[in-house]
Amino acid sequence: INNFIVATEPLGEAAKDLLSEPVAVADTRFVVNYWRLSEDNRLLFGGGESYGYRFPDIIKTVSKPMLQVYPQLAKTRITHAWGGTLAITVNRMPCFTRPGQNVLSASGYSGHGVAMATLAGKLMAEASAGQMERFDLMASLPQHRFPGGVALRWPLLITAMTWFSMRDRLGL
């Protein structure tokens, strides 16, 4: 799954009208929107997804939900836009495994890679030092293969993501 983010021009004192505290925010949608202010008072706003190999017009894709949250930014210039591909698991929980003797693996951070990869590294370091308990606890979380095998994986993924995105748009 591809996800995108934009940064506005510095907002100066107007930034306090958006967020009065230095917090990161995420909504409850399935196709989640998330935002925070940067050190120089730019709004960093992420959202939107795509499921293929080509990225859409990122500014257009992310501006729509950003302006739904903050319509007062309609005339604000977006100075940066970028995106990336995320590994998403079926249950959106990371996948910790031991694929072989003396081999540890962690992946599928579902958009939370900065925090989860840091945790995974710590748990892998502990496990490498013989303290397996916390790594094994994460490895015990149930993981499910995406249904449909090779032939149906992409069609089912696109159908499911379109369905959940439509539910978000309809407010269901």
Language model region names:
Residues G100-S105, S110-L172:
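C-terminal lid/capping helical subdomain adjacent to the catalytic/cofactor pocket in oxidative enzymes
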Residues I1-E13, D17-Q101:
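Active-site substrate-recognition segment that forms the wall
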